[in-house]
C-alpha cells in the first residue's frame, strides 16, 4: 500500500520513446531491471571507491556499494510507504557515472576536461542511461521513465546554477524540472548512499589497519554501539565484536532516517509527489543530532582514511594514469576501440572529441585503466 505522497507507477509521465507496457512488471521495475542488465552496471564490479582494485578482495567496490545502497533504500522506502522499485532503481543507478579510481579519478578527469565543460559523475550517469548504453533496437540509452531520470539527476537536491554539459544536453530534450526537489524516493536513495558509505568505509578502514576499534570508540555515534556489545557479549572475539557494533551503528542510522522523515513528511502536509517536489526543503533526512555526529565521523574519516599517507600515495599515482590516458587519446582518437569511431567521425570540434574521450575513460575499470596505461607505455 502506497502512501499518498509516493510516486505511483500508474501515473508515470512515461518514456521518451513510448513503449508497450508490461503485463507483469511496473514501469519502475522495468527501469530497475534495465539498470541491472546495463554494461555500465556490470563494470562497477571493478571500480573502487577508496582502495584500488588490486589491493584486496574484501574491500567494497562500486558494485557492492550500489547493491548495499539498494538494500537500504528498499528498507527505508517500505517503512515510509514509498515506491520501493523506483527507490531501488535510483539507488542502483546512482554510481553509474563514476570513473575508475573513485573520486581521485573523477578529479583528474575533471581537470583534463576543464577546457571542454568539465566532468561530473552525476551528469555522466544521466548520459549513460540516455545515450551511451547502446543495446536496444529502437533507442540509445535505457529509455527510463521520467521519474527515474528525474530521481537520478536530482537525488542530491535541486540542481541550481550552471548545469554540467551532459545534464544540460539531456534536459534540453527532457525537462527534468531541475529547480525543484525530487520525489521522496529519490531523497531516500541519497540518504541510503550516505548510510552505506558511512558504514562500509568505516569497516574497510578498520580492515585496512588505518585506525583501530579503540580509535572509533572515541566517536560519539560509534561508542554506544561498542559499549552495548561489550555489555551483552562480554569476551566476544574481535571480529564478532566489531561486526555486532557496526551493525548497531548501521541500524541507528536507518532508524533515525525513518523516524525523522516520518515526522517531516507529516509536518509538511504533503499529500502527493507533486507537493513533495514543491516544498522548499527535503523531507527525507537525518535528525539534527545524528547529522552532528555524522559530521564528526566524516571529519575523522577524512583525516584517518581519505587523506591517509598510504592512500594518498596511490591516489597520486592513479591520477597520473587518468591524465595520461586522456592526453593520449585526445591526440590519438582513432586509437580508441572501433565502437567509438562513429562518434569520432561525427565530432566537429575539439570539445566534441574531448567529450568522447571522456566517455571512454570514465567507463574504464580500475584494472583496465592500469593495464592500458602500462601497455601504451605512457609512464615511460
Curated annotation (Swiss-Prot):
Provide any one GO MF term from the record.
triphosphoric monoester hydrolase activity
Matching SMART domains:
HDc (SM00471)
Hydrolase among keywords: yes
Q: Which InterPro entries match?
A: dGTPase, Diverse_Catalytic_Enzymes, dNTPase_2, HD/PDEase_dom, HD_domain, PHydrolase_assoc_dom
UniProt domain HD: residue ranges: 62-198
Q: Where are the stretches annotated Disordered?
A: 1-28
Cite a single Pfam family from the UniProt record: HD_assoc
Q: Which UniProt keywords apply?
A: Hydrolase
Query: Which CDD domains does the entry mention?
Result: HDc (cd00077)
> Known HAMAP family for this protein?
dGTPase_type2
- Tell me its family: Belongs to the dGTPase family. Type 2 subfamily.
Q: What is this protein called?
A: Deoxyguanosinetriphosphate triphosphohydrolase-like protein
Q: Which organism is it from?
A: Ruegeria sp. (strain TM1040)
